UniProtKB/Swiss-Prot annotation:
Protein's name according to its UniProt entry: Major prion protein
Region (5 X 8 AA tandem repeats of P-H-G-G-G-W-G-Q): 54-95
Sequence ranges of the Sequence repeats: 54-62, 63-70, 71-78, 79-86, 87-95
Gene3D superfamilies in the record: Prion/Doppel protein, beta-ribbon domain
Function, as annotated: Its primary physiological function is unclear. Has cytoprotective activity against internal or environmental stresses. May play a role in neuronal development and synaptic plasticity. May be required for neuronal myelin sheath maintenance. May play a role in iron uptake and iron homeostasis. Soluble oligomers are toxic to cultured neuroblastoma cells and induce apoptosis (in vitro). Association with GPC1 (via its heparan sulfate chains) targets PRNP to lipid rafts. Also provides Cu(2+) or Zn(2+) for the ascorbate-mediated GPC1 deaminase degradation of its heparan sulfate side chains.
Sample GO molecular function, one term: cuprous ion binding
Region annotation (Interaction with GRB2, ERI3 and SYN1) ranges: 25-234
Prosegment residue ranges: 235-257
Residues reported to bind Cu(2+) 4: H88, G90, G91
Length: 257
């Protein structure tokens, strides 16, 4: 008899909890969409020019805090604590620990599992780019540029344009336009520098098309990140609502008691 009363109270509390959750305020949907009209960014419209000037005082091809091709804390080709052909710690080959003919082997670096899990969950953080993350690869969008020549040129050269974008977490921006503007700036800058370093140059038509392609991908990336961010917030609200807390506390009381 007592067990039936306890089961009835648990059922009542469970129904009350879900009824309270159903009355929660619905989250707003992000604005904007694919190719919804004219450009939303100032400074566009100049033929052949870059419509997204880089911010923060850095020039094209200069990452934050250092020059391209310069690693942190040392030059290329210089290992830590010794020269090439020498093991760590200053010992010579074949001299190790008092035994004859042993090779001194450098210790293997330990993998930080927290960093691996964070990169898998939110995208890889790009070193030297001020905390930007690299999004997953996308299919390049089909875009019409208003002329047969440009449409054909885009179809023939789209493989030369980026299919991933750099971005920061959406909670660092007040709206979609700010996210997309910053995303386009850093992605176009990084792709242009990387490609020109390999000896390939872009024409004015290429720059125009790269900006359009990257803009569409940045909008898609924002919508994806915003939805994931909203779902995480909904989970926090779910488990922090008073009825759910009361139900969990009651169940723990029954288990412990």
């Amino acid at each position: 008899m007592v067990k039936s009363h306890i089961g009835g109270w648990i059922l009542v509390l469970f129904v009350a909890a879900w009824s309270d959750i159903g009355l929660c305020k619905k989250r707003p949907k992000p604005g904007g969409g694919w190719n919804t009209g004219g450009s939303r960014y100032p400074g566009q419209g100049s033929p052949g020019g870059n419509r997204y000037p880089p911010q923060g005082g850095g020039g094209w091809g200069q990452p934050h805090g250092g020059g391209w091709g310069q690693p942190h804390g040392g030059g290329w080709g210089q290992p830590h604590g010794g020269g090439w052909g020498q093991p760590h710690g200053g010992g010579g080959w074949g001299q190790g620990g008092g035994s004859h003919g042993q090779w001194n082997k450098p210790s293997k670096p330990k993998t930080n599992m927290k960093h691996v899990a964070g990169a898998a969950a939110a995208g890889a953080v790009v070193g030297g780019l001020g905390g930007y993350m690299l999004g997953s690869a996308m299919s390049r969008p089909l875009i019409h540029f208003g002329s047969d020549y440009e449409d054909r040129y885009y179809r023939e050269n789209m493989y030369r344009y980026p299919n991933q974008v750099y971005y920061r977490p959406v909670d660092q921006y007040s709206n979609q336009n700010s996210f997309v503007h910053d995303c386009v700036n850093i992605t176009v800058k990084q792709h242009t520098v990387t490609t020109t370093t390999k000896g390939e140059n872009f024409t004015e038509t290429d720059v125009k098309m790269i900006e359009r392609v990257v803009e569409q991908m940045c909008i898609t990336q924002y919508q994806k990140e915003y939805e994931a961010y909203a779902q995480r917030g909904a989970s926090v609200i779910l488990f922090s609502s008073p009825p759910v807390i009361l139900l969990i506390s009651f169940l723990l009381f029954l288990i412990v008691g």
